[in-house]
Amino acid sequence: MTIILGIDPGSRITGYGVIRQQAGKVEYLGSGCIRTSGEQLSDKLKQIYDGISEIILQFKPDLFAIEQVFMAKNPDSALKLGQARGSAIVAAVNAGLPVAEYAARQVKQSVVGTGAADKEQVQHMVKQLLKLPACPQADAADALAVALCHSHTQQTLIRMAGKVHGTARGRLR
């Protein structure tokens, strides 16, 4: 059993999603958003760090996956996003978690089947894959998609290792 924490970073809203991966199946554990307040970026970064640290204490994940920075039209926005990512990554590293990073297109490809999917398509597929009663908020859905992408990647690596080393139905022997 592996618990995966997925993060969709942002300087104003950072989404998080937690899933459990067991025997090739995934189960929803929780999701939400860390909403920062205040004018100073340093205060917002501390709020992100503290929020991620609390989530790590609550869910005790084994793995941490985060979306990479995309090239924004506004360089200032890209810098702030990078700093928000850094704050989240430091929280994970301080908790001893391994960190995996995925491009947004890779996450969408893994969850929806196309790297050009829009937010609504991601929300819908996350709802379907995790058997949720309703679509999660967009930032939380993106974070759950990151966690699902990491889960799919891990399962693929296990299957590939099995072809070399021998596995029983996708699980390491």
UniProtKB/Swiss-Prot annotation:
Coiled coil: none annotated. It catalyses: Endonucleolytic cleavage at a junction such as a reciprocal single-stranded crossover between two homologous DNA duplexes (Holliday junction). Its main location: cytoplasm. The keyword Disulfide bond does not apply. The active site is at 8, 67, 139. One of its GO terms (biological process) is DNA recombination. Its cofactor is Mg(2+). It is found in: Cytoplasm. Pfam families: RuvC (PF02075). Mg(2+) 2 binds at residue 67. GO terms for molecular function: crossover junction DNA endonuclease activity; DNA binding; magnesium ion binding. Its EC number is 3.1.21.10. The keyword S-adenosyl-L-methionine does not apply. Keywords: Cytoplasm, DNA damage, DNA recombination, DNA repair, DNA-binding, Endonuclease, Hydrolase, Magnesium, Metal-binding, Nuclease. Mg(2+) 1 binds at residues 8, 139. The RuvA-RuvB-RuvC complex processes Holliday junction (HJ) DNA during genetic recombination and DNA repair. Endonuclease that resolves HJ intermediates. Cleaves cruciform DNA by making single-stranded nicks across the HJ at symmetrical positions within the homologous arms, yielding a 5'-phosphate and a 3'-hydroxyl group; requires a central core of homology in the junction. The consensus cleavage sequence is 5'-(A/T)TT(C/G)-3'. Cleavage occurs on the 3'-side of the TT dinucleotide at the point of strand exchange. NCBIfam families: PRK00039.2-1, ruvC. Belongs to the RuvC family. This is Crossover junction endodeoxyribonuclease RuvC.
